[in-house]
Amino acid sequence: MAYLSIRNPSGWGAAMALVAASLAATAHAGELEVLHFWDVGDDAKAAQVLKAAMQRDGHTWKDFVLSADGNGVPLTLLRSRVLSGNPPTAAQIKTPVIQQWARQGVLANVDDVARAEHWDTVLPKAVSDAMKYKGSYVAVPANVHRINWLWINMRVLRQVNGRVPTTWDEFFATAEAMKRAGYVAVAHGGQPWQDFILFENVALGVGGVDFYRKAFVTLDPDALAGPVMAQVLQTFRRIKAYAGPTVMGRDWILASSMLVKGRAGMQFMGDWAKPLFLAAQKDAGLEFSCVPAPGATKAYAFAVDSFALFKVKSAARVKAQKDFAAELLSPAVQEEFNLDKGSIPVRLGVDLTRFDRCGKQSGAAFDAAARAGTLVPSVSMALPPAIEDVMREAISAYWHDDRISAQATMQRLVAAARGAAMPPRTH
């Protein structure tokens, strides 16, 4: 560090000019504390895109990072921070929880940013509605993940003379061929959330869009405990025979690596798995295909990563918050962030030229499903965590314990729905 001498007045003048310029540049800079779960791998790489954008705007990014497997811990810590009057600037939370926070009056209104950036025009209505409370924006979306993907190791598929399945009959025929050839047909982890994603895929593929909405959006007890759900559960359990030995708590990345190494043939997983497959394609020559899960080729089950924006006190933090909201939905950030994340831009009209074929396919399918009315939210998008948690536990228990009947599981699903105290969502 260079020190200035009091014997050099010209040095003082230059220093004061430098300080003045620095103060002018940072007069509106603020700290942006963000609660998120993007702490490893490609998620962390994608988060760096957001950090860099905010740093270019002169703001300081502060991570409030929590493990995605923290169960109820993140919400507990967030609640404690909010109640103490010291909330983070933004928090990555699910859309039903956004509505809960909004009803408590602790979220910031960013309609001024939304109007300036034309959010009502550049966002799909199914997404923009979820970001609003009583007609005002209180949150900002980052991306769209497709949930109903089936990933296939094409070398394994060719070796067993299998075909890319579009129906469940075709799927089980392919799975049987892979199993007989000594492969694990379906790579699957042993975590409850993975069990539930697989179940969602089966429910949509077996029951169809109307059934899915009745069961998991409107919580119709006849759908949750009827003959179609019984068929869904039967199909779901049948897959278990092709998943190999289930290891409780096995991370999804370890399951995906089975596909990469050629030990497994297929995997049901959202498109956050894609960067891993793309890396393997580049480094190890992996040949993989991404196709809609069986039975739901025209449907698109989606999840959106979103940030609730909390009321903050200082003008500098408010400025940082508004800049964050604007930057997150800017075309440039949408493109770079989603290229790293494996998802697709939530903003309409972003150029997908640099995206891989799966990204382009996902974007086209999302638009087509929106037009056809076959766009459905993932359960995590549709239901509050308290209900989703009970349903997830019931489905995971059914998967891991063959002694549990489909009838008992359906009763647990209905009980979860009846215990739901869901105030009507207001947009």
Spell out what each predicted region is.
Residues 30, 52, 56, 160, ...:
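Extracytoplasmic/periplasmic substrate-recognition and gating elements
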Residues 111-124, 206-231, 279-283, 292-299:
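Short, solvent-exposed loop/beta-turn-alpha elements that line the ligand-binding surface or hinge
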